[in-house]
Amino acid sequence: MPLDARIRARPALSHRAEENRNMHHEADVVVVGAGIFGCAVAWALGNQGRSVILLEKSLKEPDRIVGELLQPGGVTALEKLGLRECLDDIDAIKVYGYDVIYYGEEVRIPYPENATDTVQEINEKQSHSDEYRGTKRKRPEGRSFHHGRFIQRLRQKAMSNPNVTTIEATATELVRCGFTGHVLGVEATRNGEQESYFGNVTIIADGYASKFRKESRTDTPVVKSKFWGLELIDADLPMPNHGHVLLGEGSPVLLYQIGTHETRALVDIPENTPTASVKAGGVKGHLKNVVLPSLPKQVQPSFQAAIDRDRLRSMPNSWLPPTTNKTPGLILLGDAMNMRHPLTGGGMTVAFNDAVLLSELLSPEIVPDLDDTKLVLQQMRKFHWRRKGLTSVINILAQALYSLFAADDYQLKALQLGCFRYFKLGGNCIDGPVGLLAGIIRQPFVLFYHFFSVALYAIWIYITSASLFGMPIRAITSIGVFWKACVVIFPYIFSELQS
């Protein structure tokens, strides 16, 4: 049965199940973290008749500078979950695509048309070559908003589910079977008291700074830069209802409206950036002396006002490849399990699609009893590989684009220019890449095709832009440009395959 049909026919559990959650702290599923993924998966499993305990250390509205742009692929997943209304009444802004500005030169990149068609419908309408390139026809929309407002709407929706009990408590450690190591639930602190919560499955979704990640994997997130955020008031954006990516000397700057009067500015600052050192005036000095002059003239007044008014806040830009959940009784998901650079705004799209897929694979029709650990682990292996059609694309694209957009050598600069000129070609040269970024096109080969199309186009520009006498030298050094392209993308491809 389709997920949305199961939502309409949601079975309510007995009063006894609710009593078990409230009095005995026992449920089919314990979810740790009422964030993007935690709320979505609690809602989805509750709609299937599962008894769910949702734990969150603080139910106050969060105040973060990321998680504010939902791509069209995420909006579609939200609709499948029956959570589309969470985008209402939060002053969310429609997003139609991107505006990329390269040293003052501008190109509009709208979301691709016909994004809601199925693969079968696309095959019927397109040639085989067009399908490989990812060409589509009917333009969808994303949404941008204040993160905290959206989270509170998700939490309200989860709390309204009769099969979900939401408790404000801080999970402190896993509860394991002393003989098998099977995870039985979590210990948590609530109102200063230690309590235990038990479930056949414990889902950990406690975010990028997860305290439980080490329970199922030994590697840690790789952080090479931070996003520093400002909130601009009544900013005059070059292209309203679009995300703006500003490229120039140094790392990229993002601008996107999150409310009627508010615009988020995110400035990427790599570690050990000299212009952001204490001697150079710190981060505020970098923003004033390096970033501000590079912005479009119309944005500069609101950016300057935000620097003078706001406290500076940052978030680490992390890379953490996915892993298969192999611990009996434990499922690690959300940012706790997989992260990519937030440049492409793909995190929430991944989370909502993971919630859809997980609820399908663990549905009562397939897994009648979540206490069947062997079957649950079998389904989690399927989950790991089935999610890659979308998540591997978003993961690899985010890391590869950041490498190009934060170019710091001549090879990457050549690829960066090639990427921008490729977008300027229009047509499929923008529909394919932005379809991948939007979570609409779920074909890794399309990513591979466009990335190396960019690389070859960049090499052609690199060679032909030289003088007649310089072309032979450029032809030789272009080998380094192609090699750099391989160095950029293949490590992330291998990490997806190995994981």
Where are these regions (language model features)?
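Conserved FAD-binding catalytic core of PHBH/FMO-like flavoproteins
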Residues: E173, G181, E187-K326
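Conserved N-terminal helical subregion
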Residues: H24-E26, T76, L87, I93-E215, ...
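Glycine-rich FAD pyrophosphate-binding loop
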Residues: V32, G46-V66
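Extreme N-terminal leader/targeting segments of oxidoreductases
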Residues: M1-V29, A44-Q48
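Generic enzyme active-site microenvironment
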Residues: L54-L55, I204, L333
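FAD/FMN-dependent oxidoreductases across multiple families
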Residues: R6-P11, T275-H384
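N-terminal Rossmann-fold NAD(P) dinucleotide-binding loop
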Residues: G38-C39
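C-terminal helical "tail/cap" subdomain of flavin- and related membrane-associated enzymes
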Residues: R6-R8, E360-S499
